[in-house]
A protein has these predicted regions:
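N-terminal subdomain of lithium-sensitive/metallo-dependent phosphomonoesterases centered on the IMPase/IPPase/PAP
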Residues: 1-89
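DPxDG-like acidic metal-binding loop motif
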Residues: 77-118
């Protein structure tokens, strides 16, 4: 994979997710809690959906590991040479407190190392 050839598409996906996150940020959103007591909002799930759909359209054969996705056992993941690592809203606690300190993160991991990040 030539990363420079997909980077503009990944940036577009991140921008689309970011727009949705900011729209929700400006609304009266609700906060729920996951089993580990970490917060989750509609922004997390909406960004996850946008990002996973976008990344699959870019590279259907590359697995996606997202904080808001299904749990994928290590026994399966340990064989992945390359995968997308996604945190749809990194800083959800700050998001819920409206500090402005949050981001959308998308990274390509190859052989255990980050090779591209948006």
């Amino acid at each position: 994979m030539h990363y420079s050839s997909v980077l503009p598409d990944v940036i577009k996906v991140a921008d689309e997710a970011s727009e949705k996150v900011l729209h929700i940020y400006q609304s009266d959103f609700k906060v729920s809690y996951k089993s580990d007591d970490s917060p989750i909002t509609a922004a997390d799930t909406a960004a996850h959906d946008i990002i996973t759909h976008g990344l699959r359209s870019i590279s259907r054969d590359i697995p996606i590991l997202s904080e808001e996705g299904k749990d994928i056992p290590w026994e399966e993941r340990k064989h992945w040479r390359r995968f997308w690592l996604v945190d749809p809203v990194d800083g959800t606690k700050d998001f819920t407190q409206r500090t402005g300190e949050f981001t959308v993160n998308i990274a390509m991991i190859e052989d255990g190392l980050p090779v591209m990040g948006v």
